[in-house]
């Protein structure tokens, strides 16, 4: 329970009258400790640690797209995305207090889905990281040497604790998946969908992935 300065003064006077100045000092110290513990923190994070339950899996992807994929261990040196050069997910994350996990789904004849997810120390850190990634991908709308490229970013959800954005991908003007960036609470993630699915399916997958990441 927080006490006002006036309440502290009254409490001090009462305690001093009964038990002396030492008791009053102890009451004041107790209040300070309680107040310090109750101060709001920008480092609020979900209670549960990251796990495989927080990343998309074969069943979820099938439910959204109707495409069957097999899960494999992701490459630890996975780059951020197909058009951001050698930049990795780690390169854009905060330097301290971060835990990462990942997932890779592989289909027949080449299609794949790679998700990279991280737990930061605060909602602010996660949102700032997501915004930086959106900027990086927005600057490289096309991949040199081919017909593959991204369209303009589309915001699926945006509020104080959640942001979900995707870039529709095209190959020779045909829909070819997309790139998802999201932050939910103190978590931030990206999903590279290299599959011939529609933009509506990518948008649906983006929302579902954010929901799963925030569990």
Predicted regions and their residues:
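Short Gly/Thr-rich strand-loop-strand
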Residues: 68-78, 131-178
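Stable alpha-helical elements in mature extracytoplasmic
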Residues: 125-136, 205, 209
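Secretory targeting and sorting signals
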Residues: 1-28
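N-terminal "mature-domain start" segment
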Residues: 26-100, 206
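Short, surface-exposed beta-strand/loop micro-motifs that present aromatic residues
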Residues: 100-106, 176-183
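A short acidic-to-branched-hydrophobic micro-motif
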Residues: 100-131
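A short, structured loop/turn motif at beta-sheet edges
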Residues: 120-125, 156-161, 184
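Surface-exposed amphipathic alpha-helical segments
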Residues: 186, 190-215
């Amino acid at each position: 329970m927080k006490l006002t300065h006036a309440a502290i003064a009254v409490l001090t006077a009462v305690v001093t009258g009964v038990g002396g100045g030492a008791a009053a000092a102890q009451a004041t110290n107790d209040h300070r400790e309680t107040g310090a513990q109750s101060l709001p923190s920008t480092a609020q994070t979900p209670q549960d640690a990251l796990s495989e339950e927080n990343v998309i899996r074969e069943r979820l992807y099938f439910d959204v797209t109707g495409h069957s994929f097999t899960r494999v261990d992701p490459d630890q040196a996975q780059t951020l995305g197909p058009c951001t050069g050698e930049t990795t997910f780690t390169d854009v994350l905060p330097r301290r207090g971060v835990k990462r996990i990942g997932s890779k789904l592989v289909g027949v004849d080449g299609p794949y889905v790679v998700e990279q997810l991280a737990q930061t120390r605060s909602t602010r850190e996660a949102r700032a990281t997501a915004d930086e990634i959106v900027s990086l991908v927005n600057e490289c709308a096309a991949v040199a040497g081919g017909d593959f490229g991204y369209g303009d970013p589309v915001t699926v959800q945006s509020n104080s604790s959640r942001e979900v954005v995707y870039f529709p991908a095209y190959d020779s003007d045909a829909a070819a998946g997309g790139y998802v960036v999201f932050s939910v609470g103190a978590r931030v993630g990206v999903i590279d969908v290299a599959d011939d699915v529609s933009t509506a399916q990518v948008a649906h997958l983006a929302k579902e992935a954010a929901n799963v990441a925030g569990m």
